Amino acid sequence: MMKNKLFIFINVFGMALAIACCIVAYFAYEYQATFDGNHTNASQIYRVSAIREFDNEVTRWGYGPLPLGGIVEQNFKDVDKSSRYHFSYSNFKRENDLFESNLSYVDPEFFEMFSFEFIKGDPKALKDVSSVFISDKMADRLFGSPEEAFGKTITQVYRTNLKEIKIAGVFKEQPQNSSFHSRDAFMNFENCKDEHVASTDDNWTQEATLFIQVNDPSRVSAIHKQLQPYIENNNKVREDFIIKELALDHFPTMAVNDQAAFVRSWTWSAPPPAAIVGSAVMGILILLIACFNLTNTAIAISSRRLKEIGIRKVMGGLRKQLIVQFIGETTLICFFAVLLGLVFGEFLTEGWNTMWPYMRVTPHYLDNPQFLIFMAVILIFTGLLAGAYPAFYISNFEPISILKGKLKFGGTNYFTRILLGLQFAISLIAIVSAIAFLQNANYQKEYDLGFDAKGSVIAWLDSKEEFETYRNSLQSNPQIISMAGAASGIFSNRVNEPVKHESKEVEVDIIDVGDHYLKTMNLTLLEGRDFVQDSETDKRESIIISQKMATMFGWEKPLGKEVIWKDTTKLYVVGVVKDVHTMGLWRSLEPLMIRYIGPEKYSQIVVNAKEANVPGLNKFMEAKWKEIFPNRLYNGYMLVENTDEVDNVNGNIVKMYSFLGVIALMLSATGLFTLVSLNIIRRTKEIGVRKVLGASIGNITRIINTEFVVILSLASIAGSVFSYFAVDLLMDSIWDYYLSTTTQTFMISIAIMFVVSAAVIGYKVFTAASLNPVNTLRDE
């Protein structure tokens, strides 16, 4: 080993990087596997979810009818505990300082069901409707410490209402892999009625999440059956929300399933599959490349140890002793790589965390027995995978053949060529993936969503008077192109409900907008007209639809067509707009129906300006807000923030595959460097003889490089074919609208691989070809 320090160091470094990737993958998996594991009663808790089916598509909702909470508490004897849950936001005031915080409304048994670590206070005080429980993070923000916050009185500000509430407890913030992470304030559910006047116990038009605790799992099936009759109560009054089944979601797997099925809920979902599967794929691929590297190096180095092996076998050495020695040496290399990998893992996890802002992977080694077992398995696996073939193959040679010099083993044989080809094929797949997602990111960034996402700012208001006052204050800004009011709009509060035309029923996105909304959001009117200002007829019966809605109903001439909404309301098409992606590219294009409303129903203002002026406009709107509404925090936001998430996901995937590509290519290139170097050493005399016979440097370079060029070419073909299907399959699982791989994608990727390979081995080959044959043949 000591005679080959450079090659051993290269392999230790490469293996350490691979093991560091496996460490990230392990803790990413642990993060998801232990999601909500901090709750002692997790295995006994279930969420009541609503299952809907429309047009043969089944969807799951993480909440159900509000009255179910009271019904279950009073009538379901098999349920041991229950709590409703509603998530909202509120402003809190301490003296003259105003703070915004999320706020969860729950029933008194909530803290008995879920595990919260209380620093101060008694969770039983949740029965008091005038109390609030806050996290230690919120306590630090308001008062500097949990001890200072406990027992203090703060003011809840909701619209124009002020309510004095007492801080009855301070709890430690939930871990990041918890459904209730970053939930900073909890109040008794009865307070929800102050925010939502319609939230009465018998109002089936309102929703809430309902959690139940069932200590005896054999009773769950009976509870599920007992829930089903109440579906009818909902469906009688909610034609827009017809439920097929009330299901029970087991809490330990709820967050993971919510993420997989895109369930709408008020709790945190588990990380996206790309964060878990991506890290695992990255770790496995890089580990395989590192193992192939070490195997190739061991095979190549063995050509310089054949005489040692022959002499040991002549002197009575047993084959199993040689096997143990070879595998032991390889395992020792892997052991040093594990130690270095633990160090690299600390840095790599920090980089991984920056890619997924809602996921915090924290490595912890010595206090984690499962991790230590995992590392032991990695050590044994890599030692055997990298060392088994050289050990068993070389130890099987006959000593007579070795000592007579009949064996020409080492350099590159069929096995090493296959391993090297696999390394570069994997590297190419990673490079293609990175470039393809980068191209897709640019494509989606410029994708026409059907509205102006980059030039709009939205703020929420509570009344017609507030809207008019705020709008008038903004009119002095010359950068504003247009303003409009709405109750619901694109990316904000839209609903999805069925409408009928004759015998056909279609579920459509519905938004309620006021004057100038089409102009402000830059919606393109293709046919018909916009709404007439202050027209009572338009408010009552006119709609503007998207192309998609016209297509789904099969209308070639949609103007004047009648649809029925909520079984009784007749609406008539007066205009058609270009298709609008109301939720960006996260889901397939949905049909859109736009209704006209008056200022008395406005709950938001939409302001449009040139893209370059939007950040400044947002600051201007915030300044005006503080003047007009001093007791409320500014709630405006740039609409582009909603579409930025698409860019972030694309960016994270590009980073992940770029990292994989760089590491894989680097490891493959070092493996190529090792093989070329050892091959040159083995062929030094051959090179000298060729030069004596008149071979030029170019000829010798071509002879040495030919087999490696062939290997890279075959790897390019294999990697291109596999990545063509794999990358498209991956993109299709994430997006409905994406840019497939192109010829340019593969040309750039293959060029990168060849250029890097040439740069790595070019100097080494040229130096060998330039050697003076007198020096190389001196011993002959």
Give the label of every model feature segment.
Residues M1-I10, G14, F292-I333, N396-L407, ...:
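Intracellular coupling helices
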Residues K3-E30, A270-K307, C334-F335, L339, ...:
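Hydrophobic alpha-helical transmembrane segments of multi-pass inner-membrane transport and secretion
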Residues K3-F7, H39, Y230-G283, S303-R304, ...:
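Membrane-helix entry/capping segments
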Residues N11, Q32, V48, V72, ...:
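Generic structural signal for small/hydrophobic residues in well-ordered secondary structure
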Residues V24, A247-D249, T331-F397, Q439, ...:
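Small-residue-rich transmembrane alpha-helices
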Residues A25-N91, D194, S199-F211, P217, ...:
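Membrane-proximal extracellular/periplasmic loop immediately following the first transmembrane helix
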Residues D107-K120, V132-P271, N472-V646:
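Mid-to-C-terminal secondary-structure elements
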Residues D136-K137, D184-A185, E190-C192, D201-W204, ...:
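Hydrophobic alpha-helices of bacterial signal-transduction systems
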